[in-house]
């Protein structure tokens, strides 16, 4: 008996190039009877997940500490060890002289990351406020602006500005990759079939990165060489021990910086003997996070 459309899991993903390898197989029909894909920017996915409008989402990692009752699908994420290319701070002044920063309305994690970096790495305390979708409008009122996704990757920088890569800044400071997003779900939603489907979707996507890059277009811009270089050199889709250590460190630092109001408890979904590792902070003196595994 076929699963009805109403019974499908509502699965949210971002409409950015960096997510294409993860959703490629789902778009080709993997778990078609179980999954209904929906697309939106990270900040909207987070709001919809918090409101109960999604069952599974490619969620900004900072939201794991804000939305209760979520579990992380083991082994899958969007991360960068070094330059991320699509997560930048566009500056009109040197970092030491930046007094005001426009946050990206599409972002949650990168907005938190820039606040952690200013506090713990760059040792300054600029004012942060929500910026505009238009970069020029944000820079009219601020010394710097956060940009994420395809607009950060493909949009030319305004004259007289420089870009600071936030992924590279994190890795230089911590020696760890930075995890921008993970597949997160409501507890009890992800069964073995969905777990396998998400992993199979990624495997299919990674096998055809050249085709993904060739087909991808953003606002009329099609640059297969740049897209392929980005997918193969900047982005990583694993969620192993280094990524989990980094995630714990980031959430603890966000708590210390006042970005989070409380310590985070993050759980990895597990199925029988496939239990994942609890997430714990690394290289930080912030209070320990409570790691647990859903069984």
PLM feature segments, named:
Residues 17-18, 41-42, 53-65, 76, ...:
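Beta->alpha turn/N-cap motifs
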Residues 25, 87-95, 100, 178-192:
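A bilobed periplasmic-binding-protein/Venus flytrap-type ligand-binding module shared by bacterial periplasmic
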Residues 36-47, 124-141:
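Short helix-initiation/N-cap motifs at beta->coil->alpha
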Residues 50-59, 123-125, 140-147:
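Alpha-to-beta junction loops
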Residues 76-135, 163, 169-171:
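A conserved helix-loop-strand patch within extracytoplasmic ligand-binding domains
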Residues 79-87, 157-187, 261-281:
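Periplasmic-binding protein-like
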Residues 130-216:
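Pocket-lining segment of extracytoplasmic ligand-binding domains
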Residues 189-257:
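Secondary-structure end/capping motifs
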């Amino acid at each position: 008996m076929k699963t009805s459309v109403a019974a499908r899991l509502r699965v949210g993903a971002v409409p950015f190039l960096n997510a294409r390898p993860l959703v490629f197989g789902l778009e080709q029909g993997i778990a078609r009877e179980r999954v209904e894909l929906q697309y939106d920017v990270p900040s909207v996915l987070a709001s919809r997940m918090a409101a109960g409008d999604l069952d599974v989402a490619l969620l900004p990692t900072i939201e794991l500490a804000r939305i209760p009752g979520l579990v992380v699908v083991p082994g899958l994420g969007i991360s960068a060890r070094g330059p991320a290319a699509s997560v930048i701070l566009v500056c009109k002044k040197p970092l030491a002289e930046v007094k005001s920063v426009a946050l990206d309305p599409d972002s949650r994690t990168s907005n938190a990351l820039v606040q952690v970096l200013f506090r713990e790495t760059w040792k300054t305390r600029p004012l942060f406020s929500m910026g505009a979708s238009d970069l020029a409008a944000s820079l009219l009122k601020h010394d710097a602006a956060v940009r994420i996704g395809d607009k950060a990757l493909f949009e030319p920088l305004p004259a007289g500005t420089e870009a600071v890569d936030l992924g590279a800044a994190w890795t230089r400071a911590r020696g760890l990759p930075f995890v921008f997003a993970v597949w997160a779900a409501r507890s009890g939603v992800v069964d073995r079939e969905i777990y396998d489907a998400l992993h199979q979707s990624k495997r299919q996507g990674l096998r055809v990165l050249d085709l993904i890059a060739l087909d991808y277009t953003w606002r009329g811009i099609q640059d297969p060489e740049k897209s392929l270089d980005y997918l193969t050199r900047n982005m990583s889709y694993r969620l192993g021990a280094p990524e989990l250590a980094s995630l714990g460190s980031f959430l603890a630092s966000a708590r210390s910086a006042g970005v989070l109001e409380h310590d985070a408890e993050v759980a990895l979904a597990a199925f029988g003997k496939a239990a994942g590792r609890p997430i714990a902070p690394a290289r930080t003196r912030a209070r320990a996070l409570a790691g647990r595994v859903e069984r």
